Amino acid sequence: MIDQIWANAAIESCLKQGIDHFFLAPGSRCTPLTLAVARQKQAHVIQHFDERGLAFAALGYARATGRPGVFICTSGTAVANAFPAVVEAAMESVPMLLFTADRPFELHGTGANQAIDQLEIFGNYVKLFSNLSVPADGSSIQGQQESAFLDSILEQAFTATKDGPVHLNWMFHEPFTIENEKPDSLACSPSDGNTGDVADHSSISLPTIEVVGNVLIVLGGCRPEEAEQALELAGQLNCPILSDVTSGLRVGSFELPTEFNLPVPDTILHLGGRIVSKTWHQWTASLADRDVNMIHVTRRARRSIRTV
């Protein structure tokens, strides 16, 4: 079946790019992708029935390693369960590949089970979306052209995921398995384009920053080595550091103040991703009438300075 050939090509391409962790929530419609992963001995598989939790596991893996994990699920509401993790990945530019199975076009709008509109279901929260309508007949010239299209899409996906999540939606036809199946000459060659090393996920880059007066560092979502850099910087500046829950920075105690009671600093240096603490945002809002410089250094080294 051409469905299986395409799935095999996609998984082999991932492995060629060093992407070897697959977060699998198996279901009938994603059988081709499941079999493709199972056939690869070097694939590391994390399997669970809870798509929401599994998507967050893929997100956590990428945060810790800088490598995208591949989230694989069946069609319908299984896809929607990944939405929270996709949003977080988008907000923090965390790499993530989503391979979702779907019913073919002819089964949409017919009342077929678990057939929902999955086209661009994650909206602007993904860096790239492609709907892959696998050709039912793999012997045509059109099918050969579409296999070249698949190679191109995979190359684009590997590049785009360096900056956030990428969604490839696979419209698979039944039957998913055939006894004694023999792949024909239409098999897609795994993508080996020069797309760079997806594992090179940029760390927080600390440009030369001139700060004056009392400094307070606040640390958002970041990788472990970035948290160590922040601690070193705090030591160099001899200033306190506040760690958001997303930072992963370990603390020696776990007090949970209902409000901040801190001396007002001259400069607030925000490193890493966004801060989710409501108390923090309330405190910074209270500084509206104070002359405080806010410097934000993100993972991509885009620096913004504002006065609060």
Name every feature range the model reports, one short phrase each:
Residues 100-154, 243-308:
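Glycine-rich, acidic loop regions that bind phosphate or pyrophosphate groups
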Residues 9-19, 61-66, 154-162, 204-215, ...:
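Glycine-rich phosphate/diphosphate-binding loops that line cofactor/substrate pockets in enzymes
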Residues 20-57, 72, 196-274:
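Anionic-ligand anchoring segments at beta-strand to alpha-helix junctions in alpha/beta enzyme folds, i.e.
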Residues 31-106, 267, 276:
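Thiamine diphosphate
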Residues 149-212:
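Conformationally flexible catalytic loops at phosphate/diphosphate-handling active centers
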Residues 42-43, 94, 238-239, 287-294:
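A short helix->loop->beta-strand "cap" motif at the edges of active sites that frequently abuts
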Residues 103, 170-176, 221-223, 246, ...:
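Glycine-rich beta-alpha junction loops
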